[in-house]
C-alpha cells in the first residue's frame, strides 16, 4: 500500500490490438514503478470480444492496484479512420471502467506528454523513452513501446495535472496540462 502522501497513477496508451498500461507512485519528487505491461487482443477475434478483454483487464488492474487517477492519451485523427474508430472504442472500454471505479481521468495529447517528459513538445519517441527510463530509475527502456508510452502518460499527469490536495491544477489546463472529466453520475 502506498504512503499517505503518495499519488498512484495509471497511464493508458489505448489501442484495440495493444493497450499499454503503466502504474506509478509519486511521493514528493520521487517516482516508483508499480507495474506496467500491455493488454493484447487477438486479431481474428470478434471486435466486441476484443473490447471486452480490454475492459476486463482494466477492471482487474483498477481493482488490484487502486490508482487515484488515470492519464490517457487523447484521441487524435490520423489518416487511417478505421484505426481511429477502433482506438476510440478501446478508449471507451477503458473509460467505462474508470468511471465505474470513480477514478478521475485526465487526457493528454502526445505533444503535451513530450513536453512534460522532455521539455520539448516535438521530441522523438526515443527521447521520451530515455527520459521515462531516467525519471523512473529503470535499468532498461520499458518494453514494449505501448507500455513505455503509458508510463510516460502517468509521469505527465504526476508532473503537471494534479496537486497533492488531489485537485485539478487551476488555470489554463487544456492547452498545457490536459483536463479532467468529473463523474456526473454520482
Task: State the predicted function of each range.
Residues 1-186:
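Phosphate- and other anionic-substrate recognition elements at nucleic-acid/protein interfaces
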